[in-house]
Amino acid sequence: NYSLGYPMTHGGWERDYVMRLVRKADFISWPKNIHSAPIVKGSTIKTTKAMEHHKDEGLSQMVRKTNRYSDIEATQFYDGKMAPVTSLTLIRKWWIESFRRGFLKRGLQDGKIGLIQSLYQGYSVFISYAKLYEKQRATK
């Protein structure tokens, strides 16, 4: 995975096994969940060769994607009857995701880009929960 033009070797982005190539005849459907995999007939295999994935060209693109995906995720959370969002929930979700990416998955070893990505992933999770809060508040 590349982000902002740099290869990501830590933080959970380094070995991203995603089904990328599917024979049309074996394709059944694709669930609407974020980061879901296609449903196919038969078995699947993992290749031994890596495929370059340039996930973000710039921060503006990242923010646009976050805004789009967080709308979907907040709706899924809301439809799943998630517990009410509190101030502590918002702080905790941001902090835990940033800590997980930066320290537990060693994203900070990727330098400044690892720091940016680790903090940004926390922000992305925060936005999803903030939008869930917005939905919960609107139905009171």
Where in this protein do the model-derived segments appear?
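Catalytic-site signature of metal-activated, phosphate-bearing donor transferases
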Residues: N1-T139
